[in-house]
Amino acid sequence: MKKSTHLLIASILAGCITSCSSGKRIAQHRIVTNPMNLNYRFQPKDESRREAADPVLEYFKGYYYLFASKSGGYWRSEDLAGWEYIPCTTIPTLEDYAPTILPIGDTLYFTTSSGKTQIFKNAHPEKDTWEAVDTKLTYRLHDPAFYSDEDGKVYMYWGCSDKDPIMGVEVDPKDGFRALGEAKALI
């Protein structure tokens, strides 16, 4: 009985060893997890919390551009794995919350939540050479977002309240993002 048990165990082990050492290799895929080592800032007041909230990402001229609140700059990447940080001093509202960006043609546009709506543009965002747009949009935007429809129309929507609705209006980017009509409650 002992011999048959030993023989059975030896056979199982031999089978396992043979199958494990077969010439077949399992393809290994690189797994990327959180490849960005963002230079998050910390809020200096009250409890210490990390910043860089409200991320927004757009593909523009072969690169992904990422903006986040209170980050002192923005990032770009060709492959979403390797990121280059671009410090920014030419957008005075960069340190405000809730950025939004919009590529139109060869230009990238930027705005944030601020007391006065200011929009900036840059045809070469790999460089910190942003210029102010003569902004004609007069609504005070809280958590704004650009939206470009398939028909070429551009909209701005905004809102962050437990009482007020999310608002939206069609805008004309060729005329300082002037509102085309009245803002409407969307939600």
What name fits each language-model region?
Residues 1-24:
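Bacterial Sec-dependent N-terminal signal peptides
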Residues 20-187:
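Carbohydrate-active catalytic/glycan-binding domains of CAZyme proteins
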